[in-house]
C-alpha cells in the first residue's frame, strides 16, 4: 500500500514532527509513504494531489491552505479512484457549502482530523483579557488560510464577548499584520504593530509554525517592552522554554 502526503513542509518544525509520526505509523503498518511539500501555494497544493495520484498512491492525506483547493483535489481523487483525507483542516459547511457537499457526495473523500480553531482563538484571547490586557495586536501568517481564519474568528468572538460584558472596560483587537512563516516576518509585524500604537499591551502571533512567535518575542525584547507587552500563541518551537529562561 502506498500513501501520499501533501504537506506545507516536511522539514520545518511542525512539518518534520508530523513526518516523524507518519513515518512511524507507516513502518508499523508496512505502508510506503511519499511526501510532496507544497508551501501552501494554491497551484502547488492542487498539483501535489495530481502528482501523488499519478505516482500510484492509493490514498492521500492533505494539509491544504484554503477550502477552494479541495474542489480540484476531490475531483482528482474521484477520477483516479484514490482515497482522500485532510489533516489540520476541515471544509467549512457554512462558508464553503458547495465544496462541503462535493466532499460528502464523493465516495473517495473520507474525512478530516482538525482542531477547533475558533475555540482555540477564544481561549487564547481570554488569557490576555484575564491578565488585564486591553489593546491587542494581531499577527497572522497567510491571508485566506483556513486555520488562520478560524483562529481569528475566535479572537474576535472573545473580544466581542468581553466588551458586551464589560461596558466600562473595553478591549480592542488590531487588524492583522501578516508575517508569513518566518521569524523575520514575525519580527517586522510586531515592530509595525508597536510603532502604530505605543499603548499596545499584548501580541498574538497566531501561528505559522512557531518561527513568527520567535521573531515577535525578539522584537519586543529589542524595544525594551518585555514588561509592558504580553504574548500568547498556539504554534511554538520545541526550544521555546529554553529561549524564555
Give the location of each predicted region.
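A residue-level marker of the well-folded mature domains of exported/periplasmic proteins
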Residues: 1-245
Amino acid at each position: 500500500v502506498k500513501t501520499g502526503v501533501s504537506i506545507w513542509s516536511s522539514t520545518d518544525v511542525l512539518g518534520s514532527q508530523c513526518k516523524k509520526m507518519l513515518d512511524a505509523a507507516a513502518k508499523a503498518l508496512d505502508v510506503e509513504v511519499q511526501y510532496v511539500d507544497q508551501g501552501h501555494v494554491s497551484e502547488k497544493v492542487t498539483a501535489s494531489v495530481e502528482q501523488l495520484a499519478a505516482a500510484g498512491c492509493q490514498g492521500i492525506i492533505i494539509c491544504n491552505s484554503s477550502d477552494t483547493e479541495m474542489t480540484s483535489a476531490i475531483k482528482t481523487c474521484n477520477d483516479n479512484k484514490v482515497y482522500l483525507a485532510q489533516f489540520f483542516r476541515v471544509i467549512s459547511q457554512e462558508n464553503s457549502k458547495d465544496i462541503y457537499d462535493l466532499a460528502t457526495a464523493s465516495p473517495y473523500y473520507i474525512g478530516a482530523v482538525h482542531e477547533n480553531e475558533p475555540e482555540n482563538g477564544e481561549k487564547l484571547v481570554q488569557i490576555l483579557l484575564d491578565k488585564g490586557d486591553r489593546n491587542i495586536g494581531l499577527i497572522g501568517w497567510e491571508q485566506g488560510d483556513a486555520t488562520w481564519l478560524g483562529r481569528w474568528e475566535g479572537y474576535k468572538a472573545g473580544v466581542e464577548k468581553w466588551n458586551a460584558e464589560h461596558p466600562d472596560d473595553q478591549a480592542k483587537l488590531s487588524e492583522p499584520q501578516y508575517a508569513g512563516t518566518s521569524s523575520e516576518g514575525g519580527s517586522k509585524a510586531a515592530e509595525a504593530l508597536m510603532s502604530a500604537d505605543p499603548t499596545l499591551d499584548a501580541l498574538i502571533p497566531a501561528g505559522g509554525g512557531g518561527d513568527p512567535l520567535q521573531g515577535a518575542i525578539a522584537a519586543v525584547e529589542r524595544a525594551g517592552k518585555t514588561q509592558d507587552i504580553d504574548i500568547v500563541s498556539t504554534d511554538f518551537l520545541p526550544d521555546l522554554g529554553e529561549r524564555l529562561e
